[in-house]
Amino acid sequence: KIGPLTMLDIGGPGMMLAYGVGRIGCQMSGDGDWGIPNLSPKPHWLSWLPDWMWSFNFPHNVNMVDPDNRIPDCVGKFCYALKLPVYPTSFYESVVCLLLFLVLWQLRHKFKAPGVLFGIYMILNGIERFFIELIRVNTRYHLAGISFTQAEMISLILVIGGIGLISYA
């Protein structure tokens, strides 16, 4: 019989991998999971990267944002691009989550107590998402003088939950 915490440990690395692969779909479709406008020039030390990895206007995005910014000679439903290039946060998340999957994969045999690996997954996922939110477009909420997004709140809960799970294990 496999206990629930062991099952969570088994699933943690796979969940990080799935999240990273899923964000590739967000990048490809331009589903609105993008960052704030990025009008900064690409730093010289990143000059070897394709431009879309620094800022991207998501042509043919499925949200059809900026309807007056139609792509010339485009036929079909998804013929719009963002007026201003934005940070491609879904791409950034994909890269980071795939790297975090490799970290979790390396750690999978290091802990004997059930639940520790999943607790680490929760902490890493929460930290990753919190920092990506700093450059992502999302609705901000205000409570007791504190401004936050829904994802930032979920990130905080993930980190606290992960710490709690590791402490419990």
List each language-model region with its residue ranges.
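A feature for loop-to-transmembrane-helix boundaries and adjacent hydrophobic helices
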Residues: K1-A169
